[in-house]
Structures are given as structure tokens and as C-alpha cells.
UniProtKB/Swiss-Prot annotation:
Entry binding sites for ATP: 4-11, 133-140
Pathway: Cell wall biogenesis; peptidoglycan recycling
Domain of life of the source: Bacteria
Protein name: N-acetyl-D-glucosamine kinase
Record-linked PROSITE patterns: ROK (PS01125)
EC number: 2.7.1.59
Binding site for Zn(2+): 157, 177, 179, 184
Length: 303
């Protein structure tokens, strides 16, 4: 059995998957906020319950936001303060007496999609998350590409390309990102960015679902906004795809539920790619909330 944990600031979710990559059992508990000991106990108790349920010693993979293992072997995860700064992988491996593998949650999302039955045919899979922020991951031949600092796929912190300023206007404001830099694309392409762009151009404060509802009703202003957003997304993706050249692009996050993104993006991409380049197949993520657990579990499929 393959056990996958999706750990965030509010919940620890465990999914148990069989050898055919099918979910057989899942359970969620609250994430301890202050006690590292309580955090370790919560994870270990879930593993013990799964081992007893299935009568085997399952493998353990964990997806968590942040940098799973820094140079000194400790976790950096601002949203999981009980475990941040602690040698989580080493401590869990010792307590559970097995090889525990960690990766960040965005890489686990990409890995989950790459191991979908329909998508395993594609050697290079790029996962793109358009949610509260913009992130993603890369999977090559079934294995995540992490980089030395676990930041491979942090597409949201690329800066706006010059073509974006040509599209939006050279007086377009470069917003300061939470990372400290100016003009990171997640400030414009995330769900928050989608809403900010609408407010910037129309001086109306609406959330992304409200704007999308107007678009679905045929509202001309919402239609113009979506066209502008899709053009900006295509411009920014053009740079990324020229570097990565994936076979498959899978889009997740809240905005992936907006069908215009997956259905209308492909026609916009070629003008931003090299003449010899082909746009990848573009699909919406298949596994929703279970994706984090799946990808974490499948860290042990990469041997």
C-alpha cells in the first residue's frame, strides 16, 4: 500500500492507495499548530491505523507547502508552524521505521496528474496551479523535478514579460509580490489577480466567481475582461513553455473550474511560441482535492 499525506495549515489528510493507484481509504485530522510532538503523533497514529487496517507496512509520502528539506535537513513551512524548522523527514523515518519521502504540495499535484491512467503516456508533464497564488511542478518520466531548493515550478514568481506590458500598457502597475519582488505574474494570473485586474480596469470590486458568473450570463464587460486575462495568461505561458516544452499541461486550482481557460487557451498560445514549437495538450486537473494525497503517495512510485 502507498500512503500519501496532504498536510496544510488546518488539516492532515491521509489517503491509502493500492498497487493500481486506486484510493482505498482516507482520513483527516486537524493539524496541531504549536506542538511538534503532537504533530508527529498525529501522523504516526494515522500510519498505524492504516497499517492495521490493511495488514501491511505501507510506504509513506508527504506533500507539504514550503521547502521540504533545507540544507540542514529541516522543514521550512510557514503555514505549518508546529513542524517548521524541524527535521521532519528524519524524525518520521525513524519513528515509523521506513523511508518517508517529502515534497512540496505543488510538485505532488503535478505528480498526481502525471500518474493519471490517461496521462502516463506523456514523458514531460507540467502542472500549473491557478488558485490563491500561481505555482506548479514538472514531472519527467514519472519523477518530479525539484531542483536543489525545491523551487522548480514556482512559475508565479516569474516577472511579467515585455509582451505583457505591450498588451496591458506600459503604464500598467507593477505590483509588489509577497516574495518582495515587483511584477510577479501570480499577482495578475491567480484568482486574486483575476479579480484585481477587473477592479483595475472597471473600478468595481468583484470576486472571481462573481465575474465568471457575469461572463456566463453574456455580460460584455466580463467578456472583455476574460479575453484580456486569457491573452495575458498566454503571453506569460509562452515564455514558460519555450523553456519547458512539455507534452502535457494540466491546470489546477480554483480557476481551473472556469472552462474558458482550458478551452480557449490553446488557440492563443502559438503566436507566443517559436514557429517550430507545438503547444502542449491542455487539460483540467482530474483529481481535485485528492491530488495532494495521490501525488505524495506516488513519491514511492518513482524508484
Amino acid at each position: 500500500m502507498y500512503y500519501g499525506f496532504d498536510i496544510g495549515g488546518t488539516k492532515i489528510a491521509l489517503g491509502a492507495f493500492d498497487s493500481t493507484r486506486r484510493l482505498q481509504w482516507e482520513k483527516r485530522v486537524p493539524t496541531p499548530h504549536t506542538s511538534y510532538s503532537a504533530f508527529l503523533d498525529a501522523v504516526c497514529e494515522l500510519v498505524a491505523e492504516a497499517d492495521q487496517r490493511f495488514g501491511v507496512k505501507g510506504s509513506v509520502g508527504i506533500g507539504i507547502p514550503g521547502m521540504p528539506e533545507t540544507e540542514d535537513g529541516t522543514l521550512y513551512a510557514a503555514n505549518v508552524p508546529a513542524a517548521s524548522g524541524k527535521p521532519l523527514r528524519a524524525d518520521l523515518s525513524a519513528r515509523l521505521d521506513r523511508d518517508v519521502r517529502l515534497d512540496n504540495d505543488a510538485n505532488c499535484f503535478a505528480l498526481s496528474e502525471a500518474w493519471d491512467d490517461e496521462f502516463t503516456q506523456y514523458p514531460l508533464v507540467m502542472g500549473l496551479i491557478l488558485g490563491t497564488g500561481v505555482g506548479g511542478g514538472l514531472v519527467l518520466n514519472g519523477k518530479p523535478i525539484t531542483g536543489q531548493s525545491y523551487i522548480t515550478g514556482e512559475f508565479g514568481h516569474m516577472r511579467l514579460p515585455v509582451d505583457a506590458l505591450t498588451l496591458m500598457g506600459f503604464d500598467f502597475p507593477l505590483r509588489r509580490c509577497g516574495c518582495g519582488q515587483m511584477g510577479c505574474i501570480e499577482n495578475y494570473l491567480s484568482g486574486r489577480g483575476f479579480a484585481w485586474l477587473y477592479q483595475h480596469y472597471y473600478d468595481q470590486s468583484l470576486q472571481a466567481p462573481e465575474i465568471i458568473a457575469l461572463w456566463e450570463q453574456g455580460d460584455e464587460q466580463a467578456h472583455a475582461h476574460v479575453e484580456r486575462y486569457l491573452d495575458l495568461l498566454a503571453v506569460c505561458l509562452g515564455n514558460i513553455l519555450t523553456i519547458v516544452d512539455p507534452d502535457l499541461l494540466v491546470i489546477g486550482g480554483g480557476l481551473s473550474n472556469f472552462t474558458a481557460i482550458t478551452t480557449q487557451l490553446a488557440e492563443r498560445l502559438p503566436r507566443h511560441l517559436l514557429p517550430v514549437a507545438r503547444a502542449p495538450r491542455i487539460e483540467r486537473a482530474r483529481h481535485g482535492d485528492a491530488g495532494g494525497m495521490r501525488g505524495a503517495a506516488f513519491l514511492h512510485l518513482t524508484d
